[in-house]
Amino acid sequence: FSKQDSDISIQRVAFMCKLLARNGVAVFSAAISPSREAREKARKEIGSFVEVYVKCPLAVCVERDITGLYQKALKGDIQDFAGASDPFEEPLNAEVVVETDKETAEESANKIFQKLIELGYVSQTGAAGHVYSPEEEDKIKERLSRLGYI
């Protein structure tokens, strides 16, 4: 993608995240966003926003890449490839940074979950073992129905 294409894609993702969040849906979005400016615009658009920087050195990305796209980009066969033939601007103030070359997937997930607890987005105890009243169940079912899940 060109920088312009990438920025437009991030704008679309941000718009959808905003719509979902505005309607009470917890939204997780995984997007390659090489531009700090595009990420900041998304942050402003969405409002309630936690940036997770999944950090990985280029050499490790190349090693893990089963598609061969990084190699093609580094050879010049693919243009506009973020992090290889095009720059990737690292976030300056991401709420969470996971270093996938140093952490296990479980450690990274736990780091993200702990930050969400710290910021008040999720409860540490969760709802395990909670028994819902008939009224609570009705409210949950009504909401899921309105959202189109049931």
PLM regions and their residue ranges:
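Small-molecule kinase domains that catalyze NTP-dependent phosphoryl transfer to phosphate-bearing small molecules
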Residues: 55-58, 63-111, 119-124
